[in-house]
Amino acid sequence: MGVPVIRAMRARFALAAATLAAATLLSADPVAYVLNGPTWSQPQTAYRINTANLDLPALSVETAVRSGANTWEQQSAAFRFVYSGPSSQTTNTNDGINLVMFRNASSGSAIATTYWWSSGSRIIDADIVFWDGAFQFFAGSSGCSGGFYIEDIAAHEFGHALGLGHSTSPNATMYPSVSACNTGNRTLDADDIAGVMALYPRLLVSAPTGLRVVP
């Protein structure tokens, strides 16, 4: 049986001044990471979670998704995701609400899909769908059997949500495939860190001038 692919299905359509897109890029460039182009305009982006699913209690899902999002704090770029509470929404649409949800359906070999909308050079909305009808999801780091840990799948999908495509480095969180019960995605590879730093360079604050320390 082949290894399921984590991918974001590519779809484009006009929606006011926005474009719906999804990260499906693969790179032949010597640099392993791939930048999709648009970025968020603010250093913090809020998201909500609809925890309704077939496999786990709501609190376990919330904790696991938040852990996956927090994976992207393992670097010093000028960007982070911020959890803003639960949601009952069940559709992914450009509504200004960045949503993570589970759907009792399948989408080919995709374990999860990230949809994002952009206006010009800025991402304005991103939604993540876990395909709960096709795969079983687990939380934590033990007990998984033939399924996938939410933490690791979420880490990959939040990478798409911040603007990264698929890396060609097999050790990267943003590599396009993952084996069952893998726990490696929750730790960023140097390639992932380089990618997010390229999108959101660290802000350097200069020390004030004209000051002296008086002993």
Give the residues covered by each predicted segment.
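Short, Lys/Arg-enriched N-terminal segments with co-localized hydrophobic residues
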Residues: M1-A8, T24-L26
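Zinc-dependent metalloendopeptidases
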Residues: L25-S206
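Bacterial N-terminal signal peptides
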Residues: A14-L25
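Enriched but not universal
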Residues: P4-R7, L204-P215
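N-terminal Sec-pathway targeting helices
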Residues: M9-F13
